[in-house]
From Swiss-Prot:
Annotated InterPro entries: NA-bd_OB-fold, Primosome_PriB/ssb, ssDNA-bd
One Pfam family named in its UniProt record: SSB
Family annotation (PROSITE patterns): SSB (PS50935)
Gene Ontology cellular-component annotations: nucleoid
Complexes and interactors: Homotetramer.
Keyword Ligase: no
GO terms for biological process, alphabetical: DNA replication
GO MF annotation list: single-stranded DNA binding
Phylogenetic placement of the source organism: Bacteria, Bacillati, Mycoplasmatota, Mycoplasmoidales, Mycoplasmoidaceae
Protein keywords: DNA-binding
Domain of life: Bacteria
Protein name: Single-stranded DNA-binding protein
Organism: Ureaplasma parvum serovar 3 (strain ATCC 700970)
Length: 166
């Protein structure tokens, strides 16, 4: 089984581009903290397609906390100088924003990580972390994301890529 779950922060603003087949793609990097005494960060290259690419470029920016679920992919390509380069990156099947404006980072992570863990494990963590903040799960294809900034701040969006892959 090839499955990766990462929580980190965007290293730079995501930028989408359209490839010749018409598909939208975003290459982005997240910084994932290492929970060791020296606390080094790992910089993980990621790729999102179509709906995720649109979500990342529309709603997220440098420094925003995100969770991704995906798989590790290794590939190679030949650059303009004829040199073969090898790349390992995470193809993001799901992307969730963990950032909420006007909240402290500790509230931010506590509420959203609980929700994310429940979605992966089926275990309700409300008993361990009592929080009165609402959680809304919304498909990226709905138009509710554009209503206003207050609602946008309260939305946790999961976007599934499985249907977009060829």
């Amino acid at each position: 089984m090839n499955k990766v779950i990462l929580i980190g922060n965007l290293v730079r603003d995501p930028e989408a581009r359209q490839i010749p087949s018409g598909r939208l793609v975003t290459n982005f990097t997240i910084a994932v903290n290492d929970n060791t005494p020296n606390a080094n960060a790992n910089f993980i290259r990621c790729v999102a397609w179509n709906n995720q690419a649109n979500f990342l470029t529309t709603y997220l920016k440098k420094g925003d906390a995100i969770a991704i679920e995906g798989r590790i992919v290794s590939r190679s390509y030949v650059d303009n100088n004829g040199k073969t380069n090898y790349v390992t990156e995470v193809y993001a099947d799901q992307v969730q924003s963990l950032s909420r404006r006007n909240q402290s980072p500790s509230d931010n992570n506590k509420v959203n990580v609980d929700t994310m863990m429940e979605s992966y494990t089926g275990i309700n963590t409300d008993a361990a972390f009592s929080s009165n903040k609402p959680q809304t799960t919304l498909s990226s294809t709905t138009s509710n994301l554009n209503k206003n900034n207050d609602e946008e701040d309260e939305i946790t969006s999961w976007i599934n890529l499985d249907d977009d892959l060829e």
